[in-house]
Each structure stands twice: as C-alpha cells, then as structure tokens.
UniProtKB/Swiss-Prot annotation:
It comes from Halobacterium salinarum (strain ATCC 700922 / JCM 11081 / NRC-1). Coiled coil: none annotated. It comes from the Archaea. The lineage of its organism: Archaea, Methanobacteriati, Methanobacteriota, Stenosarchaea group, Halobacteria. Keywords: ATP-binding, FAD, Flavoprotein, FMN, Nucleotide-binding, Nucleotidyltransferase, Transferase. It catalyses: FMN + ATP + H(+) = FAD + diphosphate. One of its GO terms (molecular function) is ATP binding. The gene is ribL. This is FAD synthase. InterPro entries: Archaeal_FAD_synthase, Cyt_trans-like, FAD_synth_RibL, Rossmann-like_a/b/a_fold. Homodimer.
Amino acid sequence: MTRVVAQGTFDLIHPGHVHYLEDAAAMGDELHVILARRENVTHKDPPVLPNRQRRDVVAALDPVDHARIGHPEDIFAPIEAIDPDVIALGFDQHHDAAAIEAELADRGLDCAVERASPREARYDDEVLSSGDIADRVLAQRGDSDP
C-alpha cells in the first residue's frame, strides 16, 4: 500500500484545494492530510476557521482517508508517525522540496517528494484562493476592515 501525505492550511476550501487532494490521492492508495495549526501559519494571514473545523471539513472530502492537525512544534512528527511513501506538495506551496528531502533523510525516512499539478480557473469568476474568498466576502458586505 502506497501512503501519501498532503499538507496545508485548508482554510475556506476552494476548487484548488480539491484538485490538490485529488492529485495527491492519485499518487498512492491511502491519502493522509496534515493541517497546519493556526499558530504555525506564518507565511500568510492566519486561518479564519479553527483547527478542528478545518480538519473535519478536509476529512469529509472524498479523496481523503485520514486527516489530522499538525504537531505544535515539530512539523515532521506526524510525517514520522505516518511513514509515507510520498509527500505531495501543492503546485504553489512555498516549501523547498530539496530541504524537505534532506530533513526526511536525516530522520531516516525513505519518502519521495512530488509536486501536484496546477489547477487553472475553469470560468472567469472562479476563486482559487482562500484569501481571495475572504476579500470577496468583505467587499460584497461592504466591510473591508475585519
């Protein structure tokens, strides 16, 4: 059985998230998803939704076999516990694949690191960004300052 890990924030689920998870699931037989804890999201605005709610929504998606919230201090701890064959990175995620491979090797994990394919918008007003969804909600409600 080929175990695949996908990871991310998964705040305000959109078609890009679904595509990423479908692509990741196609890389193996069992898809594990690790959701970044709110306090660990430092490269963008923190998630709007709580950790458990984001996990529960992701767990309900068809391609996902298991979903868990990441470790508060060591982002590789859940990966060690899962012992995957593949880590699937989102096509636009900021992660350095070579650095991940080096850390996996240092921890004795034999795991491939692959990038998911991009998902292009299928129609003019399709929104493929959680931040863009939040901005659109605020703009349509006339409140640009949360």
